[in-house]
From Swiss-Prot:
Name of this protein: NDR1/HIN1-like protein 2
More details: Plants over-expressing NHL2 develop leaf necrotic lesions surrounded by chlorosis.
Topology relative to the membrane: Single-pass membrane protein
Glycosylation sites (chain numbering): N109, N141, N151, N223
Localization per Swiss-Prot or TrEMBL: Cell membrane
Coiled-coil region(s): none
Keywords: Cell membrane, Glycoprotein, Membrane, Plant defense, Transmembrane, Transmembrane helix
General function of this protein: May play a role in plant immunity.
Residue stretches spanning the membrane: 57-77
GO cellular component, one term: chloroplast
Record organism: Arabidopsis thaliana (Mouse-ear cress)
Amino acid sequence: MGSKQPYLNGAYYGPSIPPPPKAHRSYNSPGFGCCCFSCLGSCLRCCGCCILSLICNILIAVAVILGVAALILWLIFRPNAVKFYVADANLNRFSFDPNNNLHYSLDLNFTIRNPNQRVGVYYDEFSVSGYYGDQRFGSANVSSFYQGHKNTTVILTKIEGQNLVVLGDGARTDLKDDEKSGIYRINAKLRLSVRFKFWFIKSWKLKPKIKCDDLKIPLGSSNSTGGFKFQPVQCDFDLS
């Protein structure tokens, strides 16, 4: 018979298990390096966002300040409307051929009066269009220029060429009357892009509407005008 096992009093769980060795964290491990770079990248992104936000806030503040300053100067000076006149006009040719092509040669001389004492005007775009009835037949461009305060500027324009112009029944009737009298009723419109200057501050671009209607211009080659001469006309100025 085999040898007897010694008597065990109570439960027996086997030999004790030693605790696992403590893990030592290495600060040179790849995991720790990635954490550092990740934190650094987050800080840089955060700083970049803060800088961009600061720049945007500064630009907005500057724009608001300039806008308020321009408004204050506008309210102080209360600029008067610039006045436009057709001072003289010469119609050298105005005739239709059988194909409804209008042959024209029109000289329009404008006088522009800036009545303001402290406000100058930049004319960035300046074009003149001639109309017969409601049909535009030609145009001319003027080079950009600056008009000082309390200044009168004379602009000479020439609208010349040929163009297809189809007139309605009413305009055809008017044309027959004009050909008979030798005096033609022509309208002119000015297309402008202007900026006002208050001291060192310039306004935003404005596009006023200038209409010079019902210009009665004698045809130069006509002998039926009875000595009629062109009379200066003030144009309508609309800044709305």
